[in-house]
């Protein structure tokens, strides 16, 4: 089976990849871009560390303009994030039967309602996976730290390649840093995955060999 994961290069979507590995033969990491920045390269770097194929998808014309319009009208990022997120999920659902992302239990945006999820799955005959939906931030950080090295950075430094970072970049280019400061929280952070901890895999391999040795002796 194949699953497409909406991938930012941060710890959340990277943890999703690790959780899905036992269940899928092929995992494709897909990063959506608004086409005017190179933040997607952060996700490409993280994908190489996870050793899964990566692809960049650019939103169709008009999505960025609508998202920026929402940002400027509401003065808050949530509605714009909730506008672009379902578009990304539905775009991938037309190509892949299984689509996953790193939305968490306590996320306000982006986040799809249960009714929207059921409608999407019924309409496109697909499966939408949210492996982190029952987990809080502290739990996710602890689990991700077990298998990943990552750093936390202010979102204004464009550390990852998610919808918020892309909208920050586009808003600054179109309307200046003042509008970014007005709409987005100044202290918001994102994570960037640096590497996958290979020693964990090596230790597990040694443990498996030890268990096999014990079984053969018994």
Predicted regions and their residues:
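Nucleotide-activated chemistry modules centered on ATP-dependent adenylation/adenylyltransferase
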Residues: 1-5, 9-218
């Amino acid at each position: 089976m194949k699953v497409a994961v909406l991938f930012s290069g941060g710890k959340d979507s990277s943890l999703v990849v690790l959780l899905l590995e036992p269940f899928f033969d092929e995992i494709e990491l897909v990063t959506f871009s608004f086409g005017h920045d190179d933040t997607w390269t952060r996700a490409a770097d993280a994908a190489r560390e996870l050793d899964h194929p990566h692809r960049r998808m650019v939103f169709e014309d008009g999505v960025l303009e609508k998202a920026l319009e929402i940002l400027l009208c509401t003065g808050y990022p949530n509605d714009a994030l909730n506008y672009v997120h379902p578009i990304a999920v539905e775009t991938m659902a037309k190509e892949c039967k299984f689509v996953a992302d790193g939305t968490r239990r306590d996320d306000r945006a982006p986040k799809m309602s249960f009714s929207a999820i059921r409608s999407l799955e019924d309409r496109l005959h697909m499966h939408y996976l949210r492996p982190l939906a029952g987990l809080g931030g502290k739990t996710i950080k602890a689990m991700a730290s077990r298998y990943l090295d990552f750093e936390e950075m202010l979102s204004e430094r464009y550390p990852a390649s998610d919808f918020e970072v892309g909208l920050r970049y586009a808003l600054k280019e179109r309307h200046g840093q003042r509008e970014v400061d007005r709409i987005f929280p100044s202290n918001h952070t994102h994570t960037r995955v640096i590497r996958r901890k290979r020693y964990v895999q090596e230790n597990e391999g040694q443990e498996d060999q030890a268990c096999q040795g014990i079984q053969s002796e018994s």
